[in-house]
Amino acid sequence: MMELESETQELHLHVNGEPEGKFSTEERSHKYSWRLRVSLYVTLLLAGETIATLLGRLYYEKGGKSTWLETLVQLVGFPLTLPCYYYLKPEPSKTKTITKKTTSSFLTLSLVYIGLGLLVAGHCILYSFGLLYLPVSTFSLISASQLAFNAVFSYFLNSQKITPFILNSLVLLTISSTLLVIQHEPESPSSTSKSAAKSKYVIGYICAVGSSAGYSLVLSLTDYAFEKILKKYTFKAILDMATYPSMVATCVVVVGLFGSGGWKKLSTEMEEFQLGKSSYILINIGSTISWQACLIGSVGLIIEVSSLFSNVISTLCLPVVPVLAVVFFRDEMSGIKLVAMFLAIWGFVSYGYQHYVNDRKPEEDQELPQSKEEEEQKQVDTIHVQA
């Protein structure tokens, strides 16, 4: 009888003991912290991208003409992150394994930041031209193709598998973007004739697609840099990746702005801006802050999850921006645009479902061993009761 009581006590300690309870509490706390960080980065990315896109279109709509300035506001906000180096000192992220190898050399890191900075500059320039020549609703729909580009780049650079759901998403997004080419009577705010409007529409379309490809390549390369070169996943690493490439890209755009002589026209442009000087300044400041918030959110999601997930969240703006464009800019929502939007949303849902399936697999793998242990424990209890 005494042996039965002692065995029962041991069983109780094994199932409900402090070590196991403590472990599960720490695990729950870690998951909560991770979800909180991801939610913050998602909010920064969605709010920043939506506001920045609408402000960029407003700049062109009310008399702004400088694509160099519109490119510059996407990049010049990097000094806003500098105070974070001194006031924020969070612990390293535990969502990924940190290797014990030594930190990459200064030369290697410099090449990484310079290379990414040049790509970011090219992407931003194409973005500015695309937004200039296309209605914001059309531009937003074409930008959804970045998800397809990112899947391809991630396959080669980040060992991402192309599953049936992802393949379905690629096909739908490609068809969605292709449909927008066949719109007859493309709109252009500065067109003087149908032929001129058509040529500008084609240029805008090419620039929008090129911008989407460039953005996707930057995300995949950033993910690759963290995995293979930086090999550390701290908040400081996020700030570094958001700051240094932006610094390089800003230098490139500033050279372009002064080299092209575009800076000479900025004072006249400000004087003639339809909403006035104050609005001109506020729009550009708002764009700068919004783009920097978007950048921090994007890099943060790359570290916490993956470049693919960051791009998926970015495309969540898809149904929001075209609707807001119709409300604020009176963009025409044609039948082709509606079909393109439906296909793009379908592609996004397919992509998102694949990510959901991937997230569920680790949980199911953990549940299987636990269920086996429970069955064994029940058998032990039955034996003890029979004894």
Curated annotation (Swiss-Prot):
UniProt-listed GO biological process terms: purine nucleobase transport
An example Gene Ontology molecular-function term: purine nucleobase transmembrane transporter activity
Sequence similarity: Belongs to the purine permeases (TC 2.A.7.14) family.
Record-given protein name: Probable purine permease 6
Alphabetical UniProt keywords: Membrane, Transmembrane, Transmembrane helix, Transport
GO cellular component: membrane
Feature: compositional bias, Basic and acidic residues: 9-24, 370-381
Encoding gene, per UniProt annotation: PUP6
SUPFAM superfamilies assigned: Multidrug resistance efflux transporter EmrE (SSF103481)
Any Pfam family matching the protein: PUNUT
Transmembrane segments: 36-56, 68-88, 106-126, 129-149, 162-182, 201-221, 238-258, 283-303, 309-329, 333-353
Residue span of region Disordered: 1-24, 362-387
Cell compartments where the protein resides: Membrane
